[in-house]
């Protein structure tokens, strides 16, 4: 059974396919090729709420980097912000939003996870 990974702050971007990169605090154990179960929300569920699966993803690339690397290299930052599902948002705005929502500093070391969604067959079974 794959480990859950929540997209509670970016569910629309995940679902519309505009997001293929996510940054996380921790997640240092991941390796290229790992398969994860994307979910709408994994923590903080109220009584009676259930985890809602969004689909399976495969890790294509994973590395650790400073969150504010996006601001140090603006060309990189512009591409990364778009890959996070926020085209047109500034690099600085994204970094400050992430730092605030994750209670970290803009220069925190984060895990950058690039992923691909696994296709589903007609029976709803994910395909490798």
What is each model feature region?
Residues 1-128:
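Structured alpha/beta reader/binder surfaces that contact nucleic acids or chromatin modification marks
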